[in-house]
Amino acid sequence: MSGLGDSSSDPANPDSHKRKGSPCDTLASSTEKRRREQENKYLEELAELLSANISDIDSLSVKPDKCKILKKTVDQIQLMKRMEQEKSTTDDDVQKSDISSSSQGVIEKESLGPLLLEALDGFFFVVNCEGRIVFVSENVTSYLGYNQEELMNTSVYSILHVGDHAEFVKNLLPKSLVNGVPWPQEATRRNSHTFNCRMLIHPPEDPGTENQEACQRYEVMQCFTVSQPKSIQEDGEDFQSCLICIARRLPRPPAITGVESFMTKQDTTGKIISIDTSSLRAAGRTGWEDLVRKCIYAFFQPQGREPSYARQLFQEVMTRGTASSPSYRFILNDGTMLSAHTKCKLCYPQSPDMQPFIMGIHIIDREHSGLSPQDDSNSGMSIPRINPSVNPGISPAHGVTRSSTLPPSNNNMVSARVNRQQSSDLNSSSSHTNSSNNQGNFGCSPGNQIVANVALNQGQAGSQSSNPSLNLNNSPMEGTGIALSQFMSPRRQANSGLATRARMSNNSFPPNIPTLSSPVGITSGACNNNNRSYSNIPVTSLQGMNEGPNNSVGFSAGSPVLRQMSSQNSPSRLSMQPAKAESKDSKEIASILNEMIQSDNSDNSANEGKPLDSGLLHNNDRLSEGDSKYSQTSHKLVQLLTTTAEQQLRHADIDTSCKDVLSCTGTSSSASSNPSGGTCPSSHSSLTERHKILHRLLQEGSPSDITTLSVEPEKKDSVPASTAVSVSGQSQGSASIKLELDAAKKKESKDHQLLRYLLDKDEKDLRSTPNLCLDDVKVKVEKKEQMDPCNTNPTPMTKPAPEEVKLESQSQFTADLDQFDQLLPTLEKAAQLPSLCETDRMDGAVTGVSIKAEVLPASLQPTTARAAPRLSRLPELELEAIDNQFGQPGAGDQIPWANNTLTTINQNKPEDQCISSQLDELLCPPTTVEGRNDEKALLEQLVSFLSGKDETELAELDRALGIDKLVQGGGLDVLSERFPPQQATPPLMMEDRPTLYSQPYSSPSPTAGLSGPFQGMVRQKPSLGAMPVQVTPPRGTFSPNMGMQPRQTLNRPPAAPNQLRLQLQQRLQGQQQLMHQNRQAILNQFAANAPVGMNMRSGMQQQITPQPPLNAQMLAQRQRELYSQQHRQRQIIQQQRAMLMRHQSFGNNIPPSSGLPVQMGTPRLPQGAPQQFPYPPNYGTNPGTPPASTSPFSQLAANPEASLATRSSMVNRGMAGNMGGQFGAGISPQMQQNVFQYPGPGLVPQGEATFAPSLSPGSSMVPMPVPPPQSSLLQQTPPTSGYQSPDMKAWQQGTMGNNNVFSQAVQSQPAPAQPGVYNNMSITVSMAGGNANIQNMNPMMGQMQMSSLQMPGMNTVCSEQMNDPALRHTGLYCNQLSSTDLLKTDADGNQQVQQVQVFADVQCTVNLVGGDPYLNQPGPLGTQKPTSGPQTPQAQQKSLLQQLLTE
């Protein structure tokens, strides 16, 4: 040892000896070599002895260091010595043997195996390739109960469950045998696998056990197998490839400790209502009471300077619907420190009587105190995500307070969608609103968020995602059905009105709303297309708002507040305060609207075509009846007030989607919204009256009143907000919403004060934000929405056509619309306003490009489909066109356009914002294209200001908006004063006309009898301006579409706004004749172009395409007309003004056709519409109807009113030249197209083709100067072969064909229709625009066998000239000349164009007057005429002419 140690201690010794000895002595070297070998051998033995695990040494590729071995040997010797000493004391033999230096290892192999198996907690067995157990360890008994001998040489499959055989074989056999594919290196590679298998437990050997199988029991074992491909030779036996297995019991899964949690229920103010500790009690832990106390205390304890988690979560929950807190710590009484996190969710109970509440899950984390609540998926309660539809800015308490009242409704989708789209997206883009709305703010400024939230909340109130489609934007609020307005207004909470709005999870409309099935309700739901950003926002947000807390949203006007909110929302109109008021009021309004809609929608649903007439008449009657029925009307007024703005905004969406009832609901929620709509006109007639109603409602404090007030403030707020459609405007809206929420939060009693404050505040905001012009326009449009039927055109005027012209036209139209809306109540009585309003609102719905595609498709899918694509191309123009197509391009579209244009066309917004203070300038739009483009924006601003004028009559709102002066300057009051009396007659006229149209059109399309006629009316509503209607309603295209229920929107009251517009324009003529021209151009574009122009252009014009004569000749004529377009535009604009004035004076009937939209639409159509091809497109748009009937007329059959409206509009527009030649040439090919489109499709009975051809070709072929427009009208009117044989004949052929078609479509009376139409055309020509209504009616009548009617109409106009219908045809020209002479005589003081206008006015009055007899002749018109009770045509003529002349 010592020698070895020496040598090892001196490692260099061996080498040194070697070096020293090797050179001298070989013997010495060999001896040294042997010594080294011996030394190495000893070292190896030492290493083996020292190694506790021989395998470790074997595995070493390099020999261990000698010094280490020796050192360890020394250590080991010392250890052994100590052990020997211990041995002597303990006498441990085993240890002696283990440590014996003579043993091969520290542990004997015999004892190593059992120790290893024990450590493995399993048994060991080896299976050969045949599956036989060649070896099994003895401890198998403790696992399976078998003895070692029992299992040796038995098949392993005997103890394996049959289901595990395949798995075992897979591991036992080489892969090449299992898979049939040779595996490289398989022969030399070890494969180890671990798998689970069931092994049989030894069955009991009880003699009583007969059925061994029944006693079989298997235990799942985990097998670790190693395949030994090489043969093993041991003890002379050759073990071929085998599988070495170790089986052990599966580790027992650790006991799962239940998550400790308890739940709290908080009200919408954040107070804990109840605590559920059942899970804690079930856990059996002691001290759970202390745990709950400490946890809640820590949860509500402020976090340093930060508010408590409870407050933070409450705010987040109220905003987003769900929230989770980070982990917070607390110490129990026993000193144990625990951590917990809380998850909260806003829940809406199914019962409408229950308030919304916040469920909080407090999860205790004893082990991972740092675990964030988000990480903890084991929350006792899964908190449904509530999208943050509620504006985060809204105080959660406010929102929560009313959540329980929110009824679950499928409208959640609408409301959610509306909220999304209510966001500034109205301003930005449709797609943006949806995505941004999905976010907490739904992409809208705080105000808009609130509005959207309100809409969402109201829409989703009762339904926690009960309507999955509602949760399109996945807004937590939406999902939970939370309504921001609920939170915003504690009053809502107390308000059962909302709750009563039946929180039907599947019915977006309150159960008490019978007309939920009515198109209004349906459209309301159907038109919440996410695609519509602005348009959709108004509709859905309005609906969502209405639907949520006000399940009455089923009707589009279900919650005017909501709708208004939605319309306001898009321009940030929904300021926080209005949102709060709306949330409260929306319930109330929802209930009110619900009732109204029950009555009105019942009417609407009962008679889709007639309901609007009856409902609107009823509503108008209520409105006319005044305060005696204000209880009802006040609700409806509340709706109207709340919906006017919303309808304007929504009209884009709702009108399109709710073409029938929705558009009407916009006006009257079908009839119900229209009471508001009608009220709106009446309130328009006296906005001050409407304002009084608001205050009255505030004073009464009724939920619906409050809602109305809230809606109105919201409108106002939205006006500032809409002004701030830009971010700033939205932020203002948000701030106001927050303010309102706070106020509602503080006191429900302050709701009135708050509403008043909001009204004032909105006014102030509007003043302070003149740049919010467009938003103001929206707001005003909202208010005009009451007069929305006519407002639609003004707003559409703000469509893609020249912004300035559009804006100016819009604003002027808005002023006219204000007047018209003043007349609207009467018109609504005529039940035409409702349908027009419906259409208008539907048109308004069309305003949004997205909405058009989404909303329009439902109501006017054919035309709407075209409109939607066109809208994509020409957002503004298309919207306008859609509006007109829907029959109320002027009002609904205008108003929606105010918002939609703002949102869709932000360019207009900024301009409006900048130009809001430039109302006067806006009133005078430039005539140039650039000027018109500027006018587009200016028109939007004007529309906003004119809408403000509506609110001016609501003195506070108008003052706040600074619209008082505008209204006063615009003479809305005068017009309302002048027109209200006329209203009675015009509405009757309108009613007669709808009836006439219903009958004539009923014959061609009995199914659309009312629907079709109302569709016509709806389209005629776009003819608020006579021209716009004609252009606006592509009868062919929209006839089928309008067939849904546009006819309900037959509300011709828009004509009243036309009259108002005419009067307003006449008023402004002196100061702003050029402006009026531009505005009228915009009107034509807007009404004919925007409402109908766009659709007409892409759709309607296509409809007209079927008329090759119109195309070929009109192209040439229109080219010529284009040359003289400026000149003729001025003439036509003046004529239209006169017509508008006449319509204002003499007819609410005519107004739809000769409404502002006509004026504005006519100029605008030329701008935006294709020049020559509009006619064919118009025809193309008519695909829905027989081409032979000049598809417009086919559709006119469906929408006789629309056709008439178109004709009226055409006549009104193209008094001198039926918008084709004169107006078309004067205005533009677009206008001609639109005009002709309408005349072609809509006015063909009047010789639309004739009118258009004669107008376009006649105007162009017989291109007439300013006087020729008059002649042009006359020419167009007599386009019969008698007038101008070549061009006129060609046009007449097309026109006659159209007339025949129209006769066929409307009524198989081609001959009477043609003569009647032509006679009417003559009358119309004579009347220029004035006879438009009669023309419209006469063509319709002629189709309806109205030849005599047409003759009476003509007799009215020029009865003195010619009474013979046959002569009429020929006499048309004479009549025209006589009319022209008469016109000249009447308008001697005026320019020739003005003379034509005066003539048109006179003729329009005559037409109305004559139209009365004319209408009286047909059963429907005659029936309705008594309602109108118009004076004798001549008397009316005189008074109207006097008024017009005085104007």
Swiss-Prot record:
Gene Ontology terms describing biological process: cellular response to Thyroglobulin triiodothyronine; cerebellum development; cerebral cortex development; estrogen receptor signaling pathway; estrous cycle; hippocampus development; hypothalamus development; labyrinthine layer morphogenesis
Entry keyword Nucleus: yes
Disulfides per UniProt: none
Motif interval(s): LXXLL motif 6: 919-923
Record motif LXXLL motif 7, residues: 1441-1445
GO cellular component annotations of the record: chromatin; cytosol; nucleoplasm; plasma membrane; RNA polymerase II transcription regulator complex; transcription regulator complex
Region of interest called Interaction with CREBBP, as start-end residue ranges on this chain: 787-994
Gene knockout outcome: Mice show partial hormone resistance: target organs such as uterus, prostate, testis and mammary gland exhibiting decreased growth and development in response to steroid hormones. Moreover, such mice are prone to obesity due to reduced energy expenditure.
Biased amino acid composition, Basic and acidic residues: 83-96, 619-628
InterPro entries: bHLH_dom, bHLH_NCOA1-3, HLH_DNA-bd_sf, NCO_DUF1518, NCOA1_bHLH, Nuc_rcpt_coact, Nuc_rcpt_coact_Ncoa-typ, Nuc_rcpt_coact_Ncoa_int_sf
Protein name as catalogued: Nuclear receptor coactivator 1
